[in-house]
Amino acid sequence: MRRKFLVAFALVFSAGCSILGGMAEREKIYGKSGPVITASFASKQVGGGDDWLVYINASDPDGDMDQIFASVEFQAGVDHPYPISITKIKPDQGKNLSGYLHLGTPDLDRPINITLNLQIRDKAGHFSAPVYFRVNIFDQSRKKGKTAQESPPPGVFQEKDLGPIMIILTTEVG
């Protein structure tokens, strides 16, 4: 599944290269530094039907962070293709970014596990190293008595909504 994720990134990157010129040309305009995700956090469990919050801090010395790419790997043994979600980064956050993305989770009759992969791309076409988050989405019958998802460490992340992760999770296969 990670291979599919990387192939999809390569295709998106190739399309960007053909439209905007080569990497050297874009680096002349936007700079040679790439984005770095400096801190990240997400709760390891969330109740079905709740929004899962994924916190990130990132920086780029050139100030040209442009998009957040997200993909989902379903629980082991289930090969369900999900699209890649692309969230635009606001220009005032191109140098330093802090906040959370949110992924809607389905109401469930059984728990599922997913892995979320995140990367940031800048306008020159550089990608950050990926970060991975595993989460258990538990069903409504087990939700009673469970606490809300974990909060991030205090003082590390801004409580700023960076946007939704536009992937609709489903438990249906095929």
Model regions and ranges:
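Structural beta-strand segments of beta-rich domains
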Residues: 50-54
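Short, solvent-exposed loop/linker segments at the N-terminal edge
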Residues: 44-49
